[in-house]
């Protein structure tokens, strides 16, 4: 009997309940709320669900995830050593059609203009007392690109990774709610009614050459983002070449789904109570909203300028698609345009700045790394 009591006491002392804190309880509640939003409300379920579950796992005491060899340490290593974000970019590249951007190259400027939100949030973060590396990692939320946000945070501010990732993916899911009021604020109804000419046909040769030339140029300009841009364009080359269908299919489906699970779960595993339950987390979430609004406004305002310069041939609404939430931001441009004129079709025109935003966010991240440096 004594031996049983000793064994039972040992089990209790070694259990997670003994080390369980109110912070762990709060974070588990946060995980459950995120699961509710993902599953019931449909907020980025493929991403927020594993992030939320990883958050719950991270706040179980005495698991040894960070110290004991195993699958969880492997997943955390995939984030720490920047393995997963480039692989996600390969899948994104395989699913992306750069045709609208090639057909109308000036929309690249709209993708660049939308990155103003990144730098607005960066300045805001510095004013709130974040150091320049932390501010850079927070600012990239404005690019509406989850993998790039995680990539930059892991290099510049690993302790803020969880908050930055949750803010980025949460606001990406809220693009249809955040963008329309900003778009309508900065445009008149007449501007929203502008119909754009049909895009020219892009040749197969152009689609094959584009990822090769883009990779070489951007990688030479900003070597720090070569892995992101290189994988993005390699995935695109798989699709556009016409002779690598199996690789394209794998990148779009099996690889993309597998890496998404690991990246999102690993992000959740970084959301420990001691690092997440701080005033900084609230500030990051607020700055993320400022970044999204700033990016949308920057794209629309540059679209207005472009419309003035080309005699009203460009609908300013497509500028809001310069954030890299593909294809959600382009769809929002289409919806807002059709609210002004049901016969207005802007989707393909908006896809130009939308895919340019993917490149633009990576370039913005590379610029920050070049200017500030990683960890």
UniProtKB/Swiss-Prot annotation:
According to the record, the segments passing through the membrane are 16-39, 46-65, 74-96, 107-130, 137-153, 160-178, 208-232, 254-271, 284-302, 316-332, 345-369
- Give the GO terms filed under biological process for this record: glutamate catabolic process via 2-hydroxyglutarate; sodium ion transport
The superkingdom of the source organism is Bacteria
* PTM field: The N-terminus is blocked.
- Which pathway does the database say it acts in? Amino-acid degradation; L-glutamate degradation via hydroxyglutarate pathway; crotonoyl-CoA from L-glutamate: step 5/5
What membrane topology term does the record carry? Multi-pass membrane protein
**Which is one Gene Ontology cellular component term of this protein?**
plasma membrane
**Which InterPro entries does the entry mention?**
OadB_MmdB
Where is this chain's protein located in or outside the cell? Cell membrane
Q: Name one GO molecular function term.
A: glutaconyl-CoA decarboxylase activity
**Could you say which EC number(s) this protein's record lists?**
7.2.4.5
Top EC class for this record: translocase
Output the Pfam families linked to this UniProt entry. OAD_beta (PF03977)
Keywords attached to this Swiss-Prot or TrEMBL record, sorted alphabetically, are: Cell membrane, Decarboxylase, Ion transport, Lyase, Membrane, Sodium, Sodium transport, Translocase, Transmembrane, Transmembrane helix, Transport
| Reactions listed under catalytic activity | (2E)-glutaconyl-CoA + Na(+)(in) + H(+) = (2E)-butenoyl-CoA + Na(+)(out) + CO2
Q: Extract the NCBIfam families matched here.
A: Na_pump_decarbB (TIGR01109)
PANTHER family of this UniProt entry?
OXALOACETATE DECARBOXYLASE BETA CHAIN 2
Q: How does it assemble?
A: Heterooctamer consisting of two alpha, two beta, two gamma and two delta subunits.
The family annotation for this protein states: Belongs to the GcdB/MmdB/OadB family.
Q: What job does the chain carry out?
A: Tunnel subunit of the primary sodium pump glutaconyl-CoA decarboxylase (GCD).
Q: What is this protein called?
A: Glutaconyl-CoA decarboxylase subunit beta
């Amino acid at each position: 009997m004594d031996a049983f009591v000793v064994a039972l006491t040992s089990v209790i002392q070694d259990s997670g309940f003994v080390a369980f804190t109110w912070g762990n309880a709060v974070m588990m509640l946060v995980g459950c709320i995120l699961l509710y939003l993902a599953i019931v409300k449909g907020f980025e379920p493929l991403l927020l669900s594993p992030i939320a579950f990883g958050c719950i796992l991270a706040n179980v005491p005495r698991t040894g995830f960070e110290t004991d060899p195993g699958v969880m340490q492997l997943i955390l290593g995939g984030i720490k050593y920047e393995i997963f974000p480039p692989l996600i970019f390969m899948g994104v590249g395989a699913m992306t059609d750069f045709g609208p951007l090639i057909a109308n190259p000036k929309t690249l400027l709209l993708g660049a203009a939308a990155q103003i939100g990144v730098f607005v949030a960066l300045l805001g973060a510095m004013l709130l007392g974040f150091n320049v590396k932390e501010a850079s990692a927070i600012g990239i939320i404005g690019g509406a690109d989850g993998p790039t946000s995680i990539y930059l945070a892991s290099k510049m501010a690993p302790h803020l990774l969880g908050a930055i990732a949750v803010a980025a993916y949460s606001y990406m899911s809220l693009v249809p709610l955040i963008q329309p009021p900003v778009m309508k604020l900065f445009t008149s109804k007449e501007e929203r009614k502008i119909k754009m000419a049909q895009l020219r046909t892009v040749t197969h040769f152009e689609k094959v050459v584009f990822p090769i030339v883009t990779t070489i140029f951007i990688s030479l300009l900003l070597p720090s983002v070569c892995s992101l841009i290189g994988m993005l364009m390699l995935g695109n080359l798989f699709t556009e070449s016409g002779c690598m269908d199996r690789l394209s299919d794998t990148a779009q489906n099996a690889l993309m789904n597998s890496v998404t699970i690991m990246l999102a779960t690993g992000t959740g595993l970084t959301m420990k109570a001691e690092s997440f339950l701080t005033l900084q987390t609230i500030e990051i979430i607020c700055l993320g909203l400022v970044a999204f609004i700033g990016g949308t406004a920057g794209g629309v305002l540059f679209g207005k300028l472009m419309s003035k310069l080309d005699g009203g041939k460009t609908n300013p609404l497509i500028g809001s698609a310069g954030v890299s939430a593909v294809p959600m931001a382009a769809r929002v441009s289409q919806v807002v345009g059709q609210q002004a004129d049901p016969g207005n079709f802007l989707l393909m025109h908006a896809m130009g700045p939308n895919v340019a935003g993917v490149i633009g966010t990576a370039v913005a991240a590379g610029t920050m790394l070049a200017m500030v440096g990683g960890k």
